[in-house]
Amino acid sequence: MNKIFAAFKPRGLSSNAFLSTLKKKYKNKKAGYSGTLDPFAKGVLIVAFGQYTKLFRFLKKTPKTYKATLWLGVYSLSLDDQNIKEIKNIKEFDLANLQQIIDQMQGIISYTPPQFSAKRINGTRAYELAKKGIEANLKPCQMEVFDCKILSYNHPFLNIEITVSEGAYIRSYCELFARKLGINATLSSLERIKEGKFVYNNEKSLNVLKYIDLKPNFIKELNKLENGAKIFVEELEFHDEGDYYIETEKYFSIINIKENTVKYLLNKVEKC
């Protein structure tokens, strides 16, 4: 069964554990997801079954929108509601001051990923090292903050909605935000509400061609796609280099054009 949909991962489950529940629910062993959510986080997780598990790299998954609660005055090794080492009662901040920092932290931001993250260090996940008390040497990264707004402030909890690029860490944003205030802070909750155009809709099966980040191309002899026959660039409507999808009534294929040569990236993927 080919299927792609937006699931809602609950808090307290790893993304892998949640995927296992979906495999059992839909009786489908070939399944995958994109965009790992930490166990303490909840929200939209893109899930695919069957041949559609090969399509993640072609999906438009950015920007991503989250709702987050920053717990001001708290020091956590993992920047979430676990591994808390210190809780301080700090003075309440002026809302205008908080808004000023929000405004400053727009655009491209440099950051270091959290020690408790899925980044790999010589094949080992950083969080596995962190659990053993080993500090990983994580390289600085960049994320783009497209928009951020304050939803509410009930000291010491600051609720925000933030839209960011793929690969961004909201925990790192929280750390940088707190640093500008001269305090520690951690996330007490995190929910992903949107990933690209994907929003939760009761696990409704989606038309994947509306969600892939590719332009359509066209060929007169559609039977070539059905048979996986060699395609020449002159047979296509568009000749510019790049990736495209071509569809028939029941199937679609993804091709690449480079140096006047056409290559199948995926062929004869059945529509759901």
From Swiss-Prot:
Pfam families recorded for this chain? TruB_N
Q: Which domain of life is it from?
A: Bacteria
Q: Is Isomerase among the key words of this record? A: yes
Please state the Enzyme Commission number of this protein: 5.4.99.25
| SUPFAM superfamilies, alphabetized | Pseudouridine synthase (SSF55120)
From the Swiss-Prot or TrEMBL record, what is one GO molecular function term?
Answer: tRNA pseudouridine(55) synthase activity
Which keywords are on file for this protein?
Answer: Isomerase, tRNA processing
Residues at the catalytic site = 38 (nucleophile)
Q: Which reaction does it catalyse?
A: uridine(55) in tRNA = pseudouridine(55) in tRNA
Transmembrane segments annotated in the record for this chain: none
- Per the UniProt entry, what is one GO biological process? tRNA pseudouridine synthesis
Q: Where does the signal peptide begin and end?
A: none
Write down the Gene3D superfamilies for this protein, in alphabetical order: Pseudouridine synthase (3.30.2350.10)
**InterPro entries to which the protein is assigned, alphabetical:** PsdUridine_synth_cat_dom_sf, PsdUridine_synth_N, tRNA_psdUridine_synth_TruB
Q: What does this protein do?
A: Responsible for synthesis of pseudouridine from uracil-55 in the psi GC loop of transfer RNAs.
Similarity comment text for this entry: Belongs to the pseudouridine synthase TruB family. Type 1 subfamily.
| Name assigned to this protein | tRNA pseudouridine synthase B
